């Protein structure tokens, strides 16, 4: 990958000038000028996904200039570097190959002169065999009973991805009850343990190093809870499996290393649901559905790696995001899925985007003088409409939004889905076109009211509109289409990081807090007053000690 400061390119300068021409142009004006706007600014993927980006403050000239930026920063070269196994995560000297985990074509992918696909396929086969034994009931716990509950213990990428996917694919789930524990707050695991029986529960401990503080604290608490009933430590092997590479620590914990599922240092945590970390997904929906998830992602990988940038969906969405973040000063993006099963999708890509591109140092080691990653947030519709949409519609901040919905619901109950989708369509229309003062006044006249007598209310009912949105309409949320959708967002994040000249696949920002926590933890072991920190931290620790006494 080349290290090119995007602001030093001629394309960036052209975009800055173009922004001056576009900043006062409205979405309504763009639609009024072009009756074919939807056709020009939308695209389908495999007849399973329609991406409509027409309700954005862009023209064909805007996209052409953004494409020039992608060319000048050598996006095509960056894509090739990732897919070929180059060590593009230079700060950790690692390749970035989550695409290999779902490489259903099985073509060789080389890292350090070695094809990784045989090992990828071997772990998949091992997960298949293990999961089928659990799901079928062939695997028995220490009292001879089949497993009924699975508890995934992990944090970050070892939790967010599997939890999001198992929830999104709940219509496909089998009889096993799935639980997820991540927070080191003892309340989290305590509440889960209240719901399960030690005789019929399988724990998955997801930690590559088997040293992650939160995960191992929860794992040891689960083990202690289990042994209070089971007694003999040999029974741990029937109720615990590991998603890890540290065979020594796994064995010392009491887990049979035959039930240790490995992954590799070229798998980043927030891109790991496709790996052994996805074992909880397999146990929830079955191996065949997991393969469909991989296949959908692989189809999007092929689209991303082979489609010209002008028609490349992840690239288009990434460029539009850069346009708002760096030229319009938008600081956030909202992800708004109109599907209750997708209720963790925004949280998943909050990590996916903010941990990837929340960087202030470029690939040359210099502080940037432009915007990198946006703040990502969101909730399912229609809940969000009754919470934060007020600010999106009438607030002072620009919040570009992605609206996501399936055309076909898994629960065709009465007219629920039509009502849900009517809101989905209405919101993007309202955000784009708003409601003028003239329309508000005419509505009053139609109601037999005199607008002049309601002058004090009229300004508050005006919607400026011109709020940008993308609409992603899926035919149906299936394992395949979900895989494609997740990969779409992954590649959008990669594209933005490549163009913005930052390292997307490290996360040094999480380290300092952990280091300080390790220093503070021993200081909390007694009741002595602390004076080794700043006055604020000292004051907080000392009040904590006083109150817990």
Curated annotation (Swiss-Prot):
PROSITE patterns found in the cross-reference section: P_GLUCOSE_ISOMERASE_1 (PS00765), P_GLUCOSE_ISOMERASE_2 (PS00174), P_GLUCOSE_ISOMERASE_3 (PS51463)
Catalytic reaction annotation: alpha-D-glucose 6-phosphate = beta-D-fructose 6-phosphate
This enzyme's EC code(s): 5.3.1.9
UniProt entry tagged with the keyword Isomerase: yes
Organism domain of life: Bacteria
Pathway assigned in UniProt: Carbohydrate biosynthesis; gluconeogenesis; Carbohydrate degradation; glycolysis; D-glyceraldehyde 3-phosphate and glycerone phosphate from D-glucose: step 2/4
Active site: residue positions: 355 (proton donor), 386, 514
GO biological process, one term: glucose 6-phosphate metabolic process
GO MF annotations, alphabetized: carbohydrate derivative binding; glucose-6-phosphate isomerase activity; monosaccharide binding
Coiled-coil stretches: none
Pfam families: PGI (PF00342)
Primary localization class, coarse: cytoplasm
Cellular component terms per the entry's GO annotation: cytosol
InterPro entries: G6P_Isomerase (IPR001672), G6P_Isomerase_C (IPR023096), Phosphoglucose_isomerase_CS (IPR018189), SIS_dom_sf (IPR046348), SIS_PGI_1 (IPR035476), SIS_PGI_2 (IPR035482)
UniProt keyword Cytoplasm present: yes
Subcellular location, record wording: Cytoplasm
Keywords: Cytoplasm, Gluconeogenesis, Glycolysis, Isomerase
Role according to the record: Catalyzes the reversible isomerization of glucose-6-phosphate to fructose-6-phosphate.
Family classification: Belongs to the GPI family.
PANTHER family to which the protein is assigned, alphabetical: GLUCOSE-6-PHOSPHATE ISOMERASE
Protein name: Glucose-6-phosphate isomerase
Organism listed in the record: Salmonella arizonae (strain ATCC BAA-731 / CDC346-86 / RSK2980)
């Amino acid at each position: 990958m080349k290290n090119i400061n995007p602001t030093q390119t001629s394309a960036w300068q052209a975009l800055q000038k173009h922004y001056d021409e576009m900043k006062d142009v409205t979405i309504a004006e763009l639609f009024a000028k072009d009756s074919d706007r939807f056709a020009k600014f939308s695209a389908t993927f495999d007849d399973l996904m329609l991406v409509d980006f027409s309700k954005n403050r862009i023209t064909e000239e805007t996209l052409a200039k953004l494409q020039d930026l992608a060319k000048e920063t050598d996006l095509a070269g960056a894509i090739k570097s990732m897919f070929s196994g180059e060590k593009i995560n230079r700060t950790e000297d690692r390749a970035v190959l989550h695409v290999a985990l779902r490489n259903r074509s099985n073509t060789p992918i080389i890292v350090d002169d070695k094809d990784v696909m045989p090992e990828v396929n071997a772990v998949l086969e091992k997960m298949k065999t293990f999961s089928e034994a659990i799901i079928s009931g062939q695997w028995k716990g220490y009292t001879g009973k089949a497993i009924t509950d699975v508890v995934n213990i992990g944090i970050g990428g070892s939790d967010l991805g599997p939890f999001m996917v198992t929830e999104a694919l709940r219509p496909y789930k089998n009889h096993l009850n799935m639980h997820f524990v991540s927070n080191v707050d003892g309340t989290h695991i305590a509440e889960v343990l209240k719901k399960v029986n030690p005789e019929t529960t399988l724990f998955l401990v997801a930690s590559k190093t088997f040293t992650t503080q939160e995960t191992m604290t929860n794992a040891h608490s689960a083990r202690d809870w289990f042994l209070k009933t089971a007694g003999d430590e040999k029974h741990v092997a029937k109720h615990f499996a590991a998603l890890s590479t540290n065979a020594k620590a796994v064995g010392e914990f009491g887990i049979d290393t035959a039930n240790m599922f490995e992954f590799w240092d070229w798998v980043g945590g927030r891109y790991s649901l496709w790996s052994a970390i996805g074992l909880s997904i397999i146990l929830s929906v079955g191996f065949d559905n997991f393969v469909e998830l991989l296949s959908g992602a692989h189809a999007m990988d092929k689209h991303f790696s082979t489609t010209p940038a002008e028609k490349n969906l992840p690239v288009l969405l990434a460029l539009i995001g850069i346009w708002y973040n760096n030229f319009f000063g938008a600081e956030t993006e909202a992800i708004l899925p109109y599907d209750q099963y997708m209720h963790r999708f925004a949280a998943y890509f909050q990590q996916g985007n903010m941990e990837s591109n929340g960087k202030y140092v470029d690939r040359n080691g210099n502080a940037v003088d432009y915007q990198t990653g946006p703040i990502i947030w969101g909730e399912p519709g229609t809940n969000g409409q009754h919470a934060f949409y007020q600010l999106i519609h009438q607030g002072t901040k620009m919040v570009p939004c992605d609206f996501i919905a399936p055309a076909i619901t898994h629960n065709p109950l009465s007219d629920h889905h039509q009502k849900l989708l009517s809101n989905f369509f209405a919101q993007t229309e309202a955000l784009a076109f708003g409601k003028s003062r003239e329309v508000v006044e005419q509505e009053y006249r139609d109601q037999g009211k005199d607008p002049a007598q309601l002058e004090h209310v009229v300004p508050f009912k005006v919607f400026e509109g011109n709020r940008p949105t993308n609409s992603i309409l899926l035919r149906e949320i299936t394992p395949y289409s979900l895989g494609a959708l997740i990969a779409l967002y992954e590649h959008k994040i990669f594209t933005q990081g490549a163009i913005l000249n930052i390292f997307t696949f490290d996360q040094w920002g999480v380290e300092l807090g952990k280091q300080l926590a390790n220093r503070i933890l021993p200081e909390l072991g007694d009741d002595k007053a602390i004076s080794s920190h700043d006055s604020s931290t000292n004051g907080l620790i000392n009040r904590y000690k006083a109150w817990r006494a």
